[in-house]
Amino acid sequence: MSKIASIGNYWDDRTIGQVVDLLQEYQDLFPTKFEDMKGILGDLGVMRIPLKEGAKPVKQRPYRLNPIYKEKVRKELDKMLAAGIIEPVEESEWVSPMVVQDKKTKGEIRICVDLRKLNDDFVHDPFPTPFTDEVLDNVGGQEVYSFTDGFSGYHQIRIHEEDRYKTTFAIEWGSFQYTVMPFGLRNAPAIFSRVVIVVFKEFIHKFLEVYFDDWTVFGLMNKHVGALRLMLVKCREHQISLNLKKCIFCVPSWYIVGTCGVQTRINGGPC
C-alpha cells in the first residue's frame, strides 16, 4: 500500500495485519487529491438551491482585493479550476463577492464567497445537525476507536447544473460558479448531515457515530475490523471518499470534535 495509514500499535501483529489488509482492499476510497475524488453517487450527492417565493436575484460588487493576495488568489483559482471545484461563467443573475482567508499553514490562503444575500433567500432545510454532547456520550467507554474523515467533505456533493449560477462570484479576472457544495451556503450542514445519516443509518449508535465529516467506529477489538469493513463497504457503495491523512485506526483512546476521552469515561485529560 503506497499510502501511509496511522494505525495504533496496541494490538498483536495479526490484528494489525488484518487492518492493513482491509485498508489495502479499500484503498480506492482514499484519494490523495481532489481530481481523484469521484463524488457521492446518485441524487443523494446532488444539491439543489430552492429560493423563497418572490426572491429577486442580487448582483454585488466585488470586495477590494488586497494587492498582497493577488498572485496567491490567481494560483488558488487555477487549482480550483483544474480540480473542477469551480468553472468559468460568462453571465449570472446572482453574483456574490469573494473573500480571502489565511490558512493556519503559513503562506496559504482559502478562497470563500460571501453568500449572505443568497442565504437570505435560500429556502431553509430543517434537517437536524448532530449535537456534540450526544455524540460524545455515545462514543465514551469503548475498548477501541477508529476515526475517519471525509475527503473535502462538502465538495463531495455536487450542485445541480440548473442551480450553479446562484453561487457565482466575480473578480477582476472573470466570473466563476461552484460545481460542488461550497462552505458558507446556508443549508450545507443540513444537506451533508442528511447524506451521512442516510448512508450510515443502520450502523449509527451501534458501532458508529457521525459528526458532519468526522465518523468514529468504536466497540470491542475482536469485532472492530468487521465494523470497519461494514463502514467501508457503505462508502464504496455510495462513492464516498476518505482522507487517509486525517484517519487514525484502532486506538484505545479517542479525540473527537476537540474533546479528549479515555476508554472508560469522558474527561478533559490527555488522550
What are these regions (language model features)?
Residues 1-271:
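Retroelement reverse transcriptase polymerase core
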